[in-house]
Each structure stands twice: as C-alpha cells, then as structure tokens.
Amino acid sequence: MEGKVLQILGPVVDVEFEGDIPAINEALYVEFEAEGEKKKVVLEVAAQIGDHIVRTIAMDLTDGLTRGEKVVATGAPIKVPVGEAVLGRIFNVTGDVIDGGEEVPADTPRWSIHRDAPPFEEQSTKMEVFETGIKVVDLLCPYMKGGKTGLFGGAGVGKTVIIMELIHNVAYKHSGYSVFAGVGERTREGNDLYHEMKESGVLDKVALCYGQMNEPPGCRNRVAMTGLTMAEYFRDEEGRDVLMFIDNIFRFAQAGAEMSALLGRIPSAVGYQPTLATEMGKLQERITSTKKGSITSIQAVYVPADDLTDPAPASVFAHLDSTTVLNRKIAEKGIYPAVDPLDSTSRILDPQIVGEEHYRVARGVQEVLQKYKDLQDIIAILGMDELSEEDKLTVARARKIEKFLSQPFFVAKVFTGADGRYVELDKTIAGFKEILEGKVDDLPENAFYMVGDLDEAKEKAEKMKAQS
C-alpha cells in the first residue's frame, strides 16, 4: 500500500492514501534525498483524520522531507529484533543497530513494540525479594521480583553507578540478562555508559536501546517500548528473570506530552497529555512476573523542580513497589552507594514477606539512624560531651551503621582500585543485627567503612589494631 506526503509539521506528517488506509500504530516509511544524502524515516500512524488521510508521528528528523514524496505502508507495527543477538549491542527505536558494528543476523526474530500485558491467569502473584547484593538496598528497601523500583536522585549522586552495579550483580549471581532503555537522556551519558560497561565487562549481558534528547518526541516516547519488547522476549520465550532499566521515565511522559500537543489534543493539568495515566499504565502493566519468568524494572525518575505532585512523576508513583532515594549529603560524606536509609521505602518490607527477623533489624536500623538525626542539632551546638550515656551509645552505633551501609562496587574498581563485594541477604541481616545488639561496640567505626559483610569489618579492625 502506497500513499503520498500531504503536509509536514515538524515531527507530524499527514499522508494521503487511495483506497484503504493503514491502521493505528502501523509503521510506514518514506525514503527521500536531503542534501545529497539518502534518508529513510519511519512514521507511525497516530490518527485517521478522514478523506483517506492519516496523521503520523515521525521516528526521526523530517528535515528535507517534501510534500508529494512516496510513502510505503508496511502492514505491521514497528518490529524490533529480539533474542540473544541483541545482547552487547545498541539499537534505536526502530531496532536498527547504531553502535557502528555489523547488522544483526537476518534470521533474528522480530517482535512488534505494541504488545498487550500478560493475561491475569499467566501472571504470578508470588511476592519474592529480588536479592541485589547491595546491603542498603536489600535491608531497607528490598526490590520485588517482577516489581518496579523508582530511583530518585539529582545529577552526580551515583544513579548510573548503581544501575551498572545491578547489571553486574544480576549477571554474576543470577546469570541473568538486562535491558537498558535510554529515554530522552543526554547522548554523552549514553556513550559513557556503553564504554563503562565495556570496561567493567558487563556489556555482553545487556541490550541497549537509545532515544536521546535531540531526537523527535515519537522516538523518545516509543524507545521505552522497544527496550521492553526485548525484555519480554527473554521472559516469555526463554523463561528468564530480566532486569529492565529505564532512564528516565519522566522523559517518556514528557515526549508523550509533546506528541499529544502536536496532534492537536486538548492538554490537561500542567500541559500534559489527557491520556498520561493510560499511556503510563500501558507501559507499566507490561512489566510484571509471569509463571515463566519475570521483568524487574528500575526506573530513574527525574522530578521537575523537585515537585513530587507534578502529574508526570505522580503518574509513576502509582505503579512503584519500592523507591531508592539517593541523597547528596550522604555522597558528600563519602558514603557510596549514597542511598538515603530513612527516605527509601519498599512495599515488601513486611514481616509476612521478608520474615520477622529481617523486618525487625531493618526497623531497628532506621530507628537508630532517626535518633542520631534528631540529636545532630544538639551535637552541633553543645558537642558530644553533653549527651547522656545512652545517647552517646546510640550515636556511636548509628555512625557504625552509616559506615556499614557503604560498600565497594565491582564496577567502581576502575576508580577506587578496591574489589567489589556482593553481600548475601542473610549476612547483611546478621551483620546489622550484631551492631544493634552492641556486640561490636568495641570496634573502631572506620573498620565498618567500605567493607562487605561483618566478618570483613572485624578483620579490618584487627589489622588497624596491629598497625597501631
């Protein structure tokens, strides 16, 4: 089926057909010459506006496209390659390789990016902890297998490093695959991530899909679905537990708002699209556990002007099972990962799911840290000497806990020179339990800094003692 370009309004292109017209979400393509170069732009049908005309959204820049150009309907939605062939490669929204390497093999299966969420009877209702090997996460804001986690933090507090460590740990411990969707973020960051993954040796376990800030809104919105489709294949066809990273989910909503305005829809609150909740729900409902496998997603959430009531982040919160909040003040103390132990939450930190002991230890740790936070004003004004003996003990334990929440990362070895640590959940719980019970009150607090489990902290204390 062929048509011709009728009108071009930036990324919105109207196409006229004779006879039948393509369905909503069908992919069309137009080949044209611009400045002596051959270009091929994929268009996706967004609306049928009557008189055999469809309104489409372009997945690439339309610079140089002119009226009357021939448009070809593919008869299907955008289809992207899936399976083992996508690992270690970078793709764009339409599934083309953009890392400068060779194309994926011709026999690679391709799936449509528009898919339904798994039916209820196939979904798993089990609530299980997804062990990450990162102490602060596993103890205080455990991730749920097949759940969704929001990663909140400003620029430069270590979101990317945590994402890379999680990719490393899921490959190392669960021999699992990860998919990373770069949605509307900086090209430089995408480039850095690729090279850092190459250096730290996790690249062959991850597929990357990029739709960067400089791309049209159609590309930035749909690239999240491209990545998700690749993850769904590993879950549904290979029965794997997959990690899905979206950086940044806010840009998905932002691109949707741009598309909506360009299509002439009436905006809702703060200028967002009227279908914001529907679009977010469609994407998030596909991220789930089935009886075959699971997709556990970690989504970086940018909060515009730190306003948590903004419709875009608010539409994300409705879907999250846990939140990992990164805090600059903690990073300034040199404690990495800079996860805020009092602000981060998880729906599954419940004695019926994680067990009584884990719950008690986690709440105990938060209680001690909260007390320490409350005492900080007194310490700043009057000094430690004015505190009661009980408060002094609380402060000493809190400082040990704070230091013990740090740990060396495998992917940061290039910067720190220290080997990474993967700490099993039971060792994490046992370690913090001993600190709370006062069994290690005699050890210096520096022995707890940047170590794995408590045994390592004890060894470090012995070494410090021998050196002094």
UniProtKB/Swiss-Prot annotation:
Entry's transmembrane regions: none
Residues reported to bind ATP: 153-160
Membrane topology summary: Peripheral membrane protein
GO cellular component, one term: plasma membrane
Catalytic activity as recorded in UniProt: ATP + H2O + 4 H(+)(in) = ADP + phosphate + 5 H(+)(out)
GO MF assignments: ATP binding; ATP hydrolysis activity; proton-transporting ATP synthase activity, rotational mechanism
Signal peptide feature range: none
Pfam families documented for this protein: ATP-synt_ab (PF00006), ATP-synt_ab_N (PF02874), ATP-synt_VA_C (PF22919)
Compartment(s) where it occurs, according to its Swiss-Prot or TrEMBL record: Cell inner membrane
InterPro entries in UniProt: AAA+_ATPase, ATP-synt_VA_C, ATP_synth_F1_bsu, ATPase_a/bsu_AS, ATPase_alpha/beta_chains, ATPase_F1/V1/A1_a/bsu_N, ATPase_F1/V1/A1_a/bsu_N_sf, ATPase_F1/V1/A1_a/bsu_nucl-bd
Enzyme Commission number(s) of this protein: 7.1.2.2
Keywords for the protein's UniProt record, in alphabetical order: ATP synthesis, ATP-binding, Cell inner membrane, Cell membrane, CF(1), Hydrogen ion transport, Ion transport, Membrane, Nucleotide-binding, Translocase, Transport
Quaternary organization: F-type ATPases have 2 components, CF(1) - the catalytic core - and CF(0) - the membrane proton channel. CF(1) has five subunits: alpha(3), beta(3), gamma(1), delta(1), epsilon(1). CF(0) has three main subunits: a(1), b(2) and c(9-12). The alpha and beta chains form an alternating ring which encloses part of the gamma chain. CF(1) is attached to CF(0) by a central stalk formed by the gamma and epsilon chains, while a peripheral stalk is formed by the delta and b chains.
Family: Belongs to the ATPase alpha/beta chains family.
Job description of the protein: Produces ATP from ADP in the presence of a proton gradient across the membrane. The catalytic sites are hosted primarily by the beta subunits.
Protein name: ATP synthase subunit beta
